């Protein structure tokens, strides 16, 4: 049953890759090939890699060829990150939540009620002091952070619509897997099930999960309208993405190319972030065109949610000094911007 359901998705992604030339072999002039993966498709992370490819190949005069692998073509998210550490995959971009196994401080960004809106998130993570921390945390894990991006609000959707706050109770909702997410789900009366993006559609089909927390772009990009119809927006949490490259691979490059790989990440970051702002504006309409609806919780439910969730960050991190310290730094930066 699982094989039958998932095969069309794989075929679709393969056809998309072929249609856009993503799986083409390295150009004759390229001295090095950089496989750059992500779990998503046709959204900001995918767009970042496209922009990065164009800029890096130009900056290196074609000495490095960037190959683009969206939609988990290089494996589930944990395997992609592991591949970057080992050097078998040269680049990856994904939500910081998935890096918590390497450094629990990455989980700070999933604290509810931390940011006001998407613009506040962008200003905070691009604050020089905060960005230096985010990028620097990857270094001890044989990865080099090259860019951070926002991906919009983390929205909720389930097979049975969640129109009121009480509708969360009893549901098994897919999360990225941080302790803060689990605590948030518990406060709402739900259960958080950690799961990489590539397993969400099968999980919904088979009943392993009742719903998922994802960006609007995921629901639209993967055309999940055949699995869920109503997306519930609360703006309690926002998604932050981190692009990393392999230190093992960088060590094999001459100094000039090594510098270009890192510098181009910072060059592309503001361009991709600007693209994200425009892209996000159309997502709700795109979902409606697919036959879905976007629902905002009523004001009284949003107020109750804030009361339930605003202490989660401090409560979960209080016994982890390094994690709590970063939470306080991010919170202060968010207030400042």
Residue ranges and their predicted role:
Residues 4-7, 21, 61:
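N-terminal compositionally biased, intrinsically disordered segments and leader/signal-like regions
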Residues 2, 30-121, 129-337:
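N-terminal secretory/targeting leader peptides
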Residues 23-29:
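Sec/Tat signal peptide C-region and signal peptidase I cleavage site
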Residues 13-18, 22:
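Hydrophobic helical h-region of N-terminal Sec-dependent signal peptides
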Residues 2-14:
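Bacterial N-terminal signal peptides that target proteins for export
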């Amino acid at each position: 049953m699982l094989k039958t359901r998932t095969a069309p998705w794989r075929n679709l992604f393969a056809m998309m890759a072929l249609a856009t030339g993503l799986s083409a072999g390295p150009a004759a002039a390229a001295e090095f090939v950089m496989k750059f993966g992500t779990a998503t498709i046709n959204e900001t992370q995918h767009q970042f890699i496209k922009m990065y490819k164009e800029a890096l190949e130009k900056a290196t005069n074609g000495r490095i060829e960037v190959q683009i692998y969206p939609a988990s073509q290089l494996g589930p998210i944990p395997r992609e990150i592991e591949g970057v550490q080992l050097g078998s995959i040269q680049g990856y971009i994904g939500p910081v939540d998935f890096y918590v196994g390497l450094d629990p401080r990455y989980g700070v960004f999933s604290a509810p009620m931390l940011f006001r809106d998407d613009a506040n998130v962008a200003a905070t993570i691009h604050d020089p002091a905060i960005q230096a921390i985010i990028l620097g945390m990857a270094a001890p894990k044989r990865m080099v952070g090259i860019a951070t991006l926002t991906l919009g609000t983390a929205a909720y959707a389930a097979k049975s619509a969640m129109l009121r706050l009480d509708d969360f109770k009893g549901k098994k909702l897919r999360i990225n897997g941080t302790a803060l997410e689990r605590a948030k789900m518990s406060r709402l009366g739900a259960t958080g099930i950690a799961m990489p993006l590539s397993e969400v559609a099968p999980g919904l089909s088979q009943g392993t999960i009742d719903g998922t927390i994802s960006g609007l772009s995921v629901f639209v990009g993967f055309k999940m309208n055949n699995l869920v119809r109503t997306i519930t927006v609360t703006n309690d949490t926002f998604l932050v993405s981190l692009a990393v490259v392999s230190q093992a691979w960088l060590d094999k490059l001459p100094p000039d190319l090594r510098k270009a790989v890192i510098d181009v990440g910072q060059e592309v970051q503001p361009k991709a972030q600007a693209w994200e702002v425009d892209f996000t504006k159309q997502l709700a309409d795109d979902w409606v065109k697919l036959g879905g609806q976007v629902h905002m919780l009523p004001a009284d439910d949003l107020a109750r949610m804030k009361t339930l969730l605003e202490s989660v960050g401090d409560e979960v991190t209080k016994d982890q000094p390094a994690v709590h310290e970063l939470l306080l730094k991010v919170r202060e930066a968010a207030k400042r911007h």
